[in-house]
């Protein structure tokens, strides 16, 4: 889902609309709303649901979704699109919950791991076996199995099925296939927005990994935009004037971890200041 998000933003000159502008954040918010609408409608366990992955990432489809975005005026009502290969299906009703960790590791040989792991709620199910807490990840299924017409929801509970996840561990390679950066975050369904924020911050806005991780979190899923405390008040007021429904002053639960390699081979690590993470080397 994070890649659909970025694919829409690729249609705009994000480098000219930085984090100090209302236009930059308006573009970010609208791409978020559109990507979440598609994700909530189409995504489920691919062993049970035909997820149109290629269609969701199709360049023409992303361009058509991006055409819905006007940074001067919020989209009145966001709905899912119809990507190539998509089947008609009911609207989903899943409430995702946070309780996750993320780390990025790079060794002396240049091998990189970006890993997100979860037990769902704090301490998972509350039951420990062999020194490990068992997760309660099944709560990531939709609590409603069918819509009013009796159609099975994409994320409904079924035997042997995996619940939908927002985990987005990311590794970015340059045009030559060489490592450039790795990032990711915990945070329930907000993971998608957190990961996208770190990528846009570094790749489009030219921020350091530390500054990209520390950027105020902005999560837009549906009609309400949740903006973290510390966000520029003038930009927030301008976004409201453009029709966005803003819930300001809300603390967010990101835990972004980043490793980036510069052109001279220097490695830079960064950890989200909101959690107990650090950048370290042997």
Q: What is each PLM-predicted segment?
A:
Residues 120-122, 187-188, 223:
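A short acidic/small-residue loop/turn micro-motif
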Residues 11-118, 127-129, 250:
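Internal maturation/activation junctions in enzymes
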Residues 111-175, 181, 205, 209:
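Active-site rim segments in enzyme catalytic domains, especially the processed small/beta chain
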């Amino acid at each position: 889902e994070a890649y659909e998000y970025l694919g829409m933003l690729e249609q705009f000159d994000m480098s000219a609309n930085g984090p100090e502008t209302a236009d930059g954040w308006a573009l970010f918010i609208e791409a978020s709303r559109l990507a979440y609408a598609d994700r909530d409608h189409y995504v489920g366990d691919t062993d049970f649901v035909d997820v149109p992955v290629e269609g969701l990432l199709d360049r023409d489809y992303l361009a058509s979704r991006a055409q819905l975005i006007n940074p001067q005026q919020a989209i009145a009502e966001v709905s899912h699109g119809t990507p190539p290969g998509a089947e008609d299906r009911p609207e989903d009703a899943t409430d995702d919950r946070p309780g996750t960790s993320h780390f990025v590791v790079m060794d002396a040989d240049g091998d990189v791991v970006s890993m997100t792991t979860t037990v769902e709620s704090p301490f998972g199910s509350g039951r420990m076996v062999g020194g490990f807490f068992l997760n309660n990840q099944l709560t990531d299924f939709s609590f409603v199995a069918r819509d009013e017409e009796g159609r099975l929801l994409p994320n409904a509970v079924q035997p042997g099925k995996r619940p939908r996840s927002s985990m987005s561990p990311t590794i970015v390679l340059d045009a030559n296939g060489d490592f450039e950066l790795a990032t990711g975050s915990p945070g329930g369904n907000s993971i998608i927005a957190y990961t996208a924020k770190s990528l846009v911050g570094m790749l489009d806005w030219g921020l350091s990994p530390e500054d990209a991780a520390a950027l105020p979190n902005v999560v837009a899923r549906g009609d309400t935009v949740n903006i973290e405390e510390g966000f520029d008040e003038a930009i927030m007021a301008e976004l409201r004037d453009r029709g966005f429904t803003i819930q300001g002053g809300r603390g967010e639960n990101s835990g972004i971890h980043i490793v980036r390699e510069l052109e001279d081979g220097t490695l830079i690590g960064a950890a989200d200041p909101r959690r107990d993470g650090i950048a370290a080397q042997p």
